[in-house]
């Protein structure tokens, strides 16, 4: 990751034959690979050492030169250069083709680039390339024009001659016939013989006429063809073409195959073509104009870059280095080889055969066939299976071509460039480590020793426990006692990273300080399980070791688990006590009436604990205790004369006192019962107001107390705890009666089936709720199940209802609700039929979960891809704009209450303008961070909405600015410059994706009054929104304000708007069963929804503009997540929506260099217009374009990022043709080329920091004997040798080398 080799751009282009020969170290002439006896590469073959370099370090092929001292010498016997064997990974060869071939990507890709350039249909192009038709490559217009009259005369003479010959022949036959007839009559022959002679003569005449007419027609055909012959004409009739060539060959040239294409490209005038196309675009319309636009894109690509279109036809094929297509010997003496070798072998074989045929001067038809086969061989090498049947290997498996090496999850991009395997890592099963502190993890001794091996070895040598590295290595491998002491010393303060797959968000990798533990399992702190989504049923985790001092510093400062208490998606704590801890703290803080010691007064906490130990006092009894350092809570009635800091006598319970002792000393007294909600509030408050150290310590205290008291609470579950409510049969009987009544009405035909279903479902839902309510009342407060659910430790009331109350209604395999309920509970046991019905839902649940996981993962991948280059690049973009966000709404009584979504909308944002009250006093200045406190103050002052900065209105040209983004939810402070907010947004939206329901719900029959339409919800709805698809059953929205009239016909309804401004009426045809949201004669406003159903975001953009479209998308996405009770901050959705609306479609190009119909980044569009306007020319006009996330990712400026996402070959084809440069601004591009990512500490503003020691430090440094004579202070530059660097063993002199 060094910065020495840094470059700012990466360009891709078309390679010409010269480039290919320039890269090559020699020509591969033979298809041989290695000699099977000697196992050495064959000369001039695919693994030849002369071309690709020696297969053993510093050794030539024939063995004349061995050893490093001959470095660089080229052996005169075998011609191999003496060098390292690893050059076989980088040296390329080439194959000189006997005939040119076209590059399949450019002719077969969609759209066909070659076809667009030469204005040929792909079908015709294929005919030419594969030798099915001739193509005219040039016509000598002047000569033809000059000679045409003479040629016409010659043609006429020849034609006349043919006619004369024909007539002469016919006359001769007629004469012969007359003679024959006369002879027959003389012989007195019968009439039949005469008829026979006549028929024979007629047949002869007909044949002569037919033959002659065919010749005349062919002559006419050839002449017409020649008269109208022009470049690019195709001729599939070989005979006609031959005759044309024989007669008029001097006036034109034509050929077949890639040669024809090559000749055309050589004589192609790009500039003239470009001017012609621009003319068509300016004046043409319809199909002609769109085709011209598409062609102009291709022509322009070659005009504006130094790419030559001849690069699309190859005269030489590059051969990739042999180590990248290896051949390895298997156990049985057989060889396994890369598919590429087979494909290259076919190319070489066919090429050599073609050369031989050309030398022999074989007939054209044979040569053409061989050329076609060569073309096909090169096609399958580049992209097997793109055209025709793929070439298969043994077992009918298609061979993997060069394109397949790049594509897909197993391709080069995703397998090796974006995700690599790393050293210094290990994995093991996890177990719980309740004794750990929040920032610690337990690391098994053996694992730690293996991970820290090089560090341990160096330290052993430093401490003189070992003479050299080799003996140190032996000591480590034999587990000598000194090794453990050294290991203990080394791992102190050296954090390790723990990761659990799937890593759905940034909390899936955190840093911990390792503690050595016995056994082989990693120990994990219970509070971080939530972040990792880990449990201890056999989950595994991976450990990674940060090596460099910078990496360790980042791990400690940014990634330590105690610094990651908040969830990046909503800014709320993720390290909340759960399950056992909650039940323990709940047990500690409940109050019990009438238990031992109630009403007593204690002089101190110790006295109360003594009474508790003596069994005189119950933990939960209400008593009075004198407390030191009591901090009152709001609402506490202080005794007269009491002052803060004095001891206070508080009425509480001992458990409550013990609970409050776990909180910080200056934290206000908590009197509430510590259930899940209360604990969440406390941790939230701690995170907001206290330093991280205090918060982490408090969380550890809560965890310890929770486990301690959970153990002592004796919470268990017995079957006797499950009490079926006595009133159940009575309630059921009442509802049975009502259900029977409904069924009766249906039998009499008073209601239809849909209504019956609806009524029954309603009745049984009521019954279920009634039984659930009765069941909750009948459970005693001390019932353990009640305590578990009430405290929020585990389970919910719905589960309890199914165990102790009633199972209720279930769905059938189609997902429709069955109108007969399961009346038993699990405690009573289900009947066979009930059990069978219940299994449907269970099976469906499992299937859905599996599908959901895959879909959700793919959604996250697309989101990351579209937003990966959104990084905070500057402090403030200086915009005045923002979004107006409500913070308070009026409730049903007209009183103001806090908006329920304020947590995810206004919270953690920056104010865009001053907030002023009715008297003009500034309550909060612009630029203030809206925390809980500020929002609370504004709410109390009666403010209902505020204008806040948003990513959507940010004016930074790349990325976004810190003020528009606001507070970083993960840290609770203003976001740092360099924070990759795009990726955090993608993770925050993708991570809860698995919890979203999969299906489009269908509750059977007419659920919504809209005729029981499927309402797409959950994950499919999120995908539909982010992909900007038009939803199913879309509802029209009013395009203008005006009066509406409804016209009904047999088949459909028409909604007609008469606009207020007098423009022409707008009609919307809708289905008759649609549910109208307006009535005849209503007045509608722009953008108002007319019928029930989902709205198409593209229509919102078209009619109401980009602002409304952005708001619509954010609200809709949030609606889906909120319906499932998942809180995500609006700003994350906004980052994605901003990326979807980043581009503009150019309508008129004005005098700018933009093409009409082109998709341009908004920043590029605005820059081009600014430039044109400043020169006093006409600017381009455009309309904002809403792109789905997949399309937006593929349309990115960075071709590396797009190619590694999807449709790799298509992206690379286009990028190479346009000679695209990748500015390397995003994260993926930099990961691919192995540079530090331009985010966080990888930004130049951090990497170019140099550390200068103070004078004092310099003086101290040189007092003792220094380990380094030329000490470097540039520790961040990494040039000095900082302490604890791992020693690469290959480069280390092992001293006693016995080899």
UniProtKB/Swiss-Prot annotation:
Quaternary structure per UniProt? The RNAP catalytic core consists of 2 alpha, 1 beta, 1 beta' and 1 omega subunit. When a sigma factor is associated with the core the holoenzyme is formed, which can initiate transcription.
The source organism is: Pseudarthrobacter chlorophenolicus (strain ATCC 700700 / DSM 12829 / CIP 107037 / JCM 12360 / KCTC 9906 / NCIMB 13794 / A6)
Locate the residues binding Zn(2+) 2: 877, 954, 961, 964
The organism's lineage is: Bacteria, Bacillati, Actinomycetota, Actinomycetes, Micrococcales
For this protein, the record's Gene3D superfamilies field holds:
1.10.132.30, 1.10.150.390, 1.10.1790.20, 1.10.40.90, 2.40.40.20, 2.40.50.100, RNA polymerase II, clamp domain, RNA polymerase Rpb1, domain 3
Gene Ontology cellular-component terms listed: DNA-directed RNA polymerase complex
Catalysed reactions, as listed in the record: RNA(n) + a ribonucleoside 5'-triphosphate = RNA(n+1) + diphosphate
* SUPFAM superfamilies (UniProt xref): beta and beta-prime subunits of DNA dependent RNA-polymerase
Domain of life from the UniProt record:
Bacteria
Q: Which PANTHER family match?
A: DNA-DIRECTED RNA POLYMERASE (PTHR19376), DNA-DIRECTED RNA POLYMERASE SUBUNIT BETA (PTHR19376:SF54)
Keywords annotated in UniProt: DNA-directed RNA polymerase, Magnesium, Metal-binding, Nucleotidyltransferase, Transcription, Transferase, Zinc
What is the protein name given in its UniProt record? DNA-directed RNA polymerase subunit beta'
E.C. number, please?
2.7.7.6
Q: What does this protein do?
A: DNA-dependent RNA polymerase catalyzes the transcription of DNA into RNA using the four ribonucleoside triphosphates as substrates.
CDD domains given for it? RNAP_beta'_C (cd02655), RNAP_beta'_N (cd01609)
Q: Name one GO biological process term.
A: DNA-templated transcription
Q: How many cofactors are bound and how?
A: Binds 1 Mg(2+) ion per subunit. Binds 2 Zn(2+) ions per subunit.
Entries under NCBIfam families matching the protein = PRK14906.1 (NF011498), rpoC_TIGR (TIGR02386)
């Amino acid at each position: 990751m060094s910065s020495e080799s840094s470059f700012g751009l990466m360009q891709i282009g078309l390679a010409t034959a010269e480039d290919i020969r320039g890269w090559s170290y020699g020509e591969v002439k033979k298809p041989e690979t290695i000699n099977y006896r000697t196992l050495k590469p064959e000369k001039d073959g695919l693994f030849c050492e002369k071309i690709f370099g020696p297969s053993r370090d510093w050794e030539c092929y024939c063995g004349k030169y061995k050893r490093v001292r001959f470095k660089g010498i080229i052996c005169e016997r075998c011609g191999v250069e003496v060098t390292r064997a690893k050059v076989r990974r980088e040296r390329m060869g080439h194959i000189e083709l006997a005939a040119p071939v076209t590059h399949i990507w450019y002719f077969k890709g969609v759209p066909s680039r070659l076809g667009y350039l030469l204005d040929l249909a792909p079908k015709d192009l294929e005919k030419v390339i594969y030798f099915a038709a001739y193509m005219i490559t040039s016509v000598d217009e002047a000569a033809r024009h000059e000679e045409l009259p003479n040629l016409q005369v010659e043609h006429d003479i020849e034609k006349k001659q043919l006619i004369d010959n024909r007539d002469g022949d016919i006359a001769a036959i007629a004469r012969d016939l007359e003679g024959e007839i006369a002879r027959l009559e003389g012989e007195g022959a019968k009439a039949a013989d005469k008829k026979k002679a006549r028929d024979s003569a007629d047949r002869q005449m007909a044949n002569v006429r037919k033959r002659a007419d065919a010749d005349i027609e062919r002559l006419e055909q050839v002449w017409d063809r020649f008269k109208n012959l022009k470049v690019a004409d195709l001729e599939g009739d070989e005979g006609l073409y031959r005759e044309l060539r024989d007669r008029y060959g001097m006036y034109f040239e034509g050929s077949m195959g890639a040669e024809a294409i090559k000749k055309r490209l050589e004589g192609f005038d790009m500039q003239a073509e470009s001017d012609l196309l621009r003319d068509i675009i300016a004046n043409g319309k319809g199909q002609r104009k769109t085709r011209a636009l598409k062609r102009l894109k291709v022509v322009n690509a070659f005009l504006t870059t130094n790419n030559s279109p001849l690069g699309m036809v190859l005269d030489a094929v590059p051969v990739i280095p042999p180590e990248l297509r290896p051949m390895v010997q298997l156990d049985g003496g057989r060889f396994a080889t890369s598919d590429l070798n087979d494909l290259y072998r076919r190319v070489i074989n066919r090429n050599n055969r073609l050369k031989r045929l050309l030398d022999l001067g074989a007939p054209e038809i044979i040569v053409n066939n061989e050329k076609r086969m060569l073309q096909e061989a090169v096609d399958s090498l580049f992209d097997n299976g793109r055209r025709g049947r793929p070439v298969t290997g043994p077992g009918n498996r298609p061979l993997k071509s060069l394109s397949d090496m790049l594509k897909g999850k197993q391709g080069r991009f995703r397998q090796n460039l974006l995700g690599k395997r790393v050293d210094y890592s290990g994995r093991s099963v996890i177990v719980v480590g309740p004794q750990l502190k929040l920032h610690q993890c337990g690391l098994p001794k053996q694992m730690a020793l293996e991970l820290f091996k090089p560090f341990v070895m160096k330290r052993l040598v430093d401490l003189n426990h070992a003479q050299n590295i080799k003996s140190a290595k032996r000591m480590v491998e034999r587990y000598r006692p000194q090794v453990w002491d050294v290991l203990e010393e080394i791992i102190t303060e050296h954090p390790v990273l723990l990761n659990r797959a799937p890593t759905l968000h940034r909390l899936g990798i955190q840093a911990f300080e390792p503690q050595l533990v016995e056994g082989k399992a990693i120990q994990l702190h219970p509070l971080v399980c939530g972040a990792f989504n880990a449990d201890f049923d056999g989950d595994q985790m991976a450990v990674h070791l940060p090596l460099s001092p910078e990496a360790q510093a980042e791990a400690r400062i940014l990634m330590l688990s105690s610094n990651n208490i908040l969830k990046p998606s909503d800014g709320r704590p993720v390290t909340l006590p759960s399950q056992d801890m909650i039940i323990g703290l709940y047990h500690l803080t409940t109050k019990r009436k009438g238990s031992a010691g109630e009403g007593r007064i204690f002089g101190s906490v110790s006295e109360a604990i003594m009474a508790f130990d003596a069994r005189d006092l119950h933990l939960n009894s209400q008593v009075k205790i004198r407390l030191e350092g009591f901090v009152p809570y709001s609402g506490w009635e202080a005794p007269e004369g009491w002052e803060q800091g004095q001891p206070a006598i508080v009425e509480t319970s001992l458990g409550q006192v013990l609970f409050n002792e776990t909180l910080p000393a200056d934290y206000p007294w908590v009197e509430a019962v510590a259930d899940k909600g209360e604990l969440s509030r406390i941790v939230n408050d701690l995170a907001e107001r206290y330093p991280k150290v205090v918060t982490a310590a408090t969380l550890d205290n809560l965890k310890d107390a929770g486990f301690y008291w959970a153990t002592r609470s004796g919470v268990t579950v017995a079957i006797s705890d499950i009490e079926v409510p006595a009133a159940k049969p009575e309630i059921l009987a009442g509802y049975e009666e009502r259900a029977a009544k409904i069924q009766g009405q249906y039998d009499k035909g008073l209601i239809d089936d849909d209504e019956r279903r609806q009524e029954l479902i309603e009745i049984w839902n009521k019954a279920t709720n009634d039984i659930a309510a009765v069941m909750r009342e009948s459970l005693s407060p001390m019932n353990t199940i009640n305590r578990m659910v009430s405290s929020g430790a585990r389970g919910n009331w719905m589960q309890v209802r199914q165990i102790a109350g009633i199972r209720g209604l279930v769905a059938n395999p189609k997902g429709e609700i069955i109108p007969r309920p399961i009346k038993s509970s699990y405690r009573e046991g289900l009947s066979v039929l009930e059990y069978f019905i219940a299994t449907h839902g269970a099976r469906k649940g499992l299937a859905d979960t599996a599908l959901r996981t895959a879909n959700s993962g793919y959604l996250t991948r697309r989101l990351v891809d579209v937003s990966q280059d959104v990084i905070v690049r500057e402090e403030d973009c200086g915009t005045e704009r923002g979004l107006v966000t409500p913070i308070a709404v009026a409730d049903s009584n007209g009183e103001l209450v806090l908006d329920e979504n304020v947590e995810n909308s206004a919270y953690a944002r920056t104010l865009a303008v001053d907030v002023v009250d009715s008297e003009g006093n500034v309550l909060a200045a612009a630029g203030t961070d809206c925390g809980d406190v500020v929002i609370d103050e504004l709410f109390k002052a009666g403010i209902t909405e505020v204008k806040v900065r948003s990513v959507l209105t940010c004016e930074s040209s790349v990325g976004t600015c810190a003020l528009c983004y606001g507070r970083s939810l993960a840290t609770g402070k203003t976001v740092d410059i360099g924070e990759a907010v795009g990726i955090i947004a993608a993770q925050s939206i993708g991570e809860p994706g698995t919890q979203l329901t999969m299906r489009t719900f269908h509750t059977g029959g007419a659920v919504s009054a809209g005729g029981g339409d499927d309402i797409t919800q959950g994950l499919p709805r999120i995908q539909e929104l982010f992909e900007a698809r038009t939803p199913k059953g879309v509802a029209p929205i009013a395009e203008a304000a005006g009066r509406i009239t409804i016209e009904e016909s047999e088949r459909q309804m028409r909604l007609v708007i008469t606009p207020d401004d007098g423009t022409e009426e707008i009609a919307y045809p809708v289905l008759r069963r649609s549910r109208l949201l307006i009535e005849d004669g209503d007045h509608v406003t722009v953008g108002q929804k007319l019928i029930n159903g989902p709205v198409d975001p593209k229509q919102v953009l078209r009619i109401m503009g980009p602002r409304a479209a952005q708001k619509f998308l954010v609200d809709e996405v949030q609606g889906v997540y909120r319906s499932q009770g998942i809180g995500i901050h609006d700003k994350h959705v906004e980052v994605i929506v901003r990326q979807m609306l980043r581009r503009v479609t150019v309508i008129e190009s004005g005098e700018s260099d933009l093409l009409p119909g082109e998709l341009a980044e908004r920043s590029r569009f605005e820059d081009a217009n600014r430039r044109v306007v400043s020169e006093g020319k006409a600017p381009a006009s455009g309309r904002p374009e809403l792109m789905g996330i997949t399309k937006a990712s593929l349309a990115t400026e960075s071709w590396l990022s797009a190619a590694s996402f999807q449709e790799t070959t298509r992206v690379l084809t286009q990028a190479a043709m346009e000679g695209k440069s990748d500015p390397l601004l995003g994260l993926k591009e930099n990961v691919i080329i192995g540079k530090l990512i331009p985010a966080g500490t990888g930004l130049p503003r951090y990497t170019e920091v140099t550390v200068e020691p103070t004078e004092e430090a310099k003086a101290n440094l040189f007092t003792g004997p220094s380990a380094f004579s030329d000490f470097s202070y540039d520790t961040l530059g990494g040039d000095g040798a900082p302490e604890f660097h791992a020693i690469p063993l290959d480069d280390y002199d092992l001293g006693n080398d016995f080899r």
